[in-house]
Amino acid sequence: ILAGLEKPDDGLVQVQSNTRIAYVAQEPQLDAASSVFDAVAEGLQRVRYLIDEYSQGHGDLDAMQSEIESLDGWNWEQRVTETLQRLHLNPEAIVSTLSGGTKKRVALAQALVAQPDVLLLDEPTNHLDLDSIEWLEGLLVDFTGSIITITHDRSFLDNVATRIVELDRGKLLSYPGNFAAYLLQKEEQ
């Protein structure tokens, strides 16, 4: 629901305006024929569309310019390049030739290049080897936005979580700390 893939059965989803949300699926859907650069640039689809419309003189140019600037869009190619370098990805590689773990990195880069306020991760350690998981943990610890993740990887949760939220039989309960702290708090209940 937060990623916009499903509609709630009832109620209202409210997100503060200008909040950027990025979602990394458990099994990333990337264009197999794309280069890694192009696949990551898909994370800036809105920016690229606005720049194209602006360049062609379509629509309200002042409003488009303001939105492009608010999205830090004029330097989108540089952002893609910097993100690829940070994640140690070859921009010229073709997606179909990549391992599952590298495809996951491409999907993460696609999300991160958009500079999201909220990063949604569905089983982020799937397809990753131990070195890649440690790399991901470091990346997430340094992430300045909010992260919501669904995972069965308890070690990963211990290393990155600052709060565990449990949904059980329609009740939402929040526990400060990592997974180990959550287990202690549950035991005390």
Regions found by a protein language model. Give the residues of each.
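ABC ATP-binding cassette signature C-motif
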Residues: 1-189
